[in-house]
Amino acid sequence: MRRLDWLDALRGLAAITVVLFHLSPQMIGNEAHLAVMRHIDLGKTAVLLFFLVSGYVIPMSLERHGSLRRFWIGRLLRIYPAYLATIALFALLAAAGLLHWQGSLRAETGAGLLAHVTMMTDLVGVRGVVRVFWTLTYEMVFYLVVTGLFAWRLHRHSAWYAAALALIAWLPLPDDLLGSTPASRRALAGVLVLGLLLTLTLIFAGRAKAAGVVAMAFVLVPAINGHPTVAGTVRSSQQALLLLAVMFAGTVIYRWQHGQIGPAAGSVALAVVAAGLIGAQWTQRAWPANVFAVATISLIAYAFRRRSMPQTLTWLGRISYSLYLQHVIVLFLLPHIIPDVGTQPLPVRVITGLTYLATVLALAWLSYRIVEQPAQRLGRRLAAKIDTRGRPHPQPSTQRAAPGTGRGENTRESV
């Protein structure tokens, strides 16, 4: 048993929940699907789980490396290959006439292309090639903010950051200060590309603190431009900051587990984030259930973290990134194969659903094997070369977590 199997199991559960959530309208009909959503939104529950796990894993990975260069080599080769493969698959199917490019991408091609370079489509205000790309926006912002905190040795104060983001979210924040017009969205997308490139250039030039300043500035974008257009999935700057607070809540759990913050600070921070999530959505009765489900599932997984996890869930966790990105593409193809699936007899819907699940799992496994794993191996080789040359940027070690992480366990991280 690997010490991080419980995190893989959480990712696996989140990934298959998203898949089933998106499939359910086809299987049980829109009315039944919406009836369930009025009580609990399983899609948002799964996304919150993903973010919580990322918040736990990313700082652990960064601090274990002790090098921003190594971290970013690993991150870039972890998230971009499957992302680009998904875009390529969509483009091939669109060229064949089976899929169509989203309207906001056709209307604002320049902004869309630039936004996809940084993965920050949701903050620019254009729809991703695949809509689920929206979550990558907040993953990337989180990576950058954590990078900045680490560069300035401010990374241990996770409880403060989680609570502060949840509280700042309640201020009267603008939703589209930087992206209210097509020209401003195009300019913002270009600035985000330059900001990311500048951050990476400074990191690899050994100027970590300068990189940290640029990286931390990215947190301003969701604070004042969280919902620039109707193409965005996040509905406000308040929601955008709360999603970042959820990721820092994952970091709070990591630091609490390893004695880097006390139980009082950890409990207060987690309570503030939970209250912020529920309070911000007080008109939607599903949100208390969403937050309760995430808390309960996380607590159960954490309680059993030293025990063997179900192999099915850990396997799903390993392929979860590709599964999350690519399952929607197969779902888009269903109407071409069986029109009006939701109106078909029950046996037809069951067979269709099982065939769909088998297909997306096989596709995700292939993507994991032929895209993700080779890229991760390349990342480890490149990182090793940096170490061999003796040029990694020295960073403060906070690795009290070493006994609980094990060697090489971040090779199975996913966002």
Could you say what each language-model-derived stretch is?
Residues P59-H65, A95, G148-H157, L198-A208, ...:
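Structural signal for the C-terminal ends of transmembrane alpha-helices
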Residues L334, P374-V415:
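Membrane-proximal cytoplasmic C-terminal regulatory module of class A 7TM GPCRs
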Residues D5-L62, Y80-Y83, G317-S320, Y324-L325, ...:
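Functionally critical transmembrane alpha-helices in membrane proteins and complexes, commonly lining
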Residues T17-H22, S54, I58, A88-L92, ...:
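Membrane-interfacial alpha-helical segments at the cytosolic side of multi-pass membrane proteins
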Residues K44-L48, S61-G97, A107, A111-A115, ...:
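Transmembrane alpha-helical segments and their boundary/interface "anchor" motifs
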Residues I79, Y83-L144, H157, L167-G179, ...:
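Membrane-interface helix-loop-helix regions
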Residues Q239-Q257, A265-Q373, P392:
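Alpha-helical transmembrane segments of multi-pass integral membrane proteins
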Residues L4-D5, L34-V47, V126-Y138, D175-G195, ...:
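Interfacial loop-to-helix transition and helix-capping segments at the boundaries
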